[in-house]
Amino acid sequence: MTRRLCEIFKSPRRDEMYLYVDRARGLADMPEALLERFGKPVPVTVLMLSEDKPLARAKASDVLAAIEAQGFYLQMPPARESYLLDLYRAPTEGRY
């Protein structure tokens, strides 16, 4: 079973966007383009991650594999529900 001490950061630019990195390596190996879009990482927590650890929106095995391969795992925000997007597209003229 693979286990890794991970540090999790949230993005100040987008709600519900998180960056998982190896605690030992930190942010030193992050691509500049990623950090530019992500913003200044805000530390959230440190977590001992193993393949059987349940996560809310990702499989722990996928997170561990991505950290091993590229040094990080980027968790994107969930897709917005289409009915919520329609509220912004609907014309508002004549409603008030």
From Swiss-Prot:
Coiled coil: none annotated. Residues 4-88 form the YcgL domain. It comes from the Bacteria. Pfam families: YcgL (PF05166). This is YcgL domain-containing protein Csal_1462. It comes from Chromohalobacter salexigens (strain ATCC BAA-138 / DSM 3043 / CIP 106854 / NCIMB 13768 / 1H11).
